[in-house]
């Protein structure tokens, strides 16, 4: 079912006026301008975004934490190594350091618009990007990279890395 420009515009307005349901609750400063440029185009609206982040979390924690883990540290900005080290308590259990790269989810008016933006994403190095066609003509583009990193820091309370900073 093909959507009219008026229907897309209405849905875009609803999306932009909706509550930000992300854990952080707002768009990351590092990509505010990019999100603004995308949303200023009639054919696109961002539905979620993250500029990238580092996370230190503990696995195997009692229920009640997201996906069975407790977040001990998170930042969407550059981090001083000492700041991260200070948040490490190996007694917590199984600690994991994780880097997640930028991700954007963009609703597109047509498949042709999505293909154009998808080509731009691929040429910019976001090789894990893709287009999803949903029910009722909904076209979504995910701009993603495969440059993530996940490193165990401690296991069963035993530190697996050194506290030394070079």
What are these regions (language model features)?
Residues 116, 120-166:
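Helix-rich interaction surfaces within compact, conserved domain-sized segments
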Residues 1-92:
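N-terminal, charge-rich interaction modules
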Residues 109-113:
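Helix N-cap motif at beta-to-alpha junctions
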Residues 100, 114:
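Compact, Lys/Arg-rich rRNA/RNP-binding cores from ribosome-related proteins
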Residues 102-108:
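Short cationic amphipathic helices and targeting signals
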Residues 95-98:
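Duplex nucleic acid-engaging cores and interfaces of nucleic-acid transaction enzymes
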């Amino acid at each position: 079912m093909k959507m009219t420009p008026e229907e897309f515009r209405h849905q875009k307005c609803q999306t932009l006026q909706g509550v930000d349901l992300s854990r952080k609750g707002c768009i990351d400063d590092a990509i505010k301008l990019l999100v603004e440029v995308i949303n200023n185009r009639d054919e696109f609206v961002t539905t979620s975004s993250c500029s990238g982040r580092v996370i230190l979390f503990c696995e195997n924690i009692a229920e009640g934490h997201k996906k069975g883990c407790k977040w001990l540290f998170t930042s969407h900005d550059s981090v001083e190594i000492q700041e991260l080290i200070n948040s490490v308590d190996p007694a917590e259990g199984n600690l994991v350091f994780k880097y997640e790269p930028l991700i954007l989810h963009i609703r597109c008016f047509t498949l042709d618009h999505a293909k154009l933006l998808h080509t731009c994403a691929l040429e910019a190095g976001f090789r894990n990007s893709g287009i999803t066609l949903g029910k009722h003509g909904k076209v979504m583009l995910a701009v993603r990279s495969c440059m993530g990193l996940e490193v165990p820091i401690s296991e069963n309370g035993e530190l697996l890395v050194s506290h030394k900073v070079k």
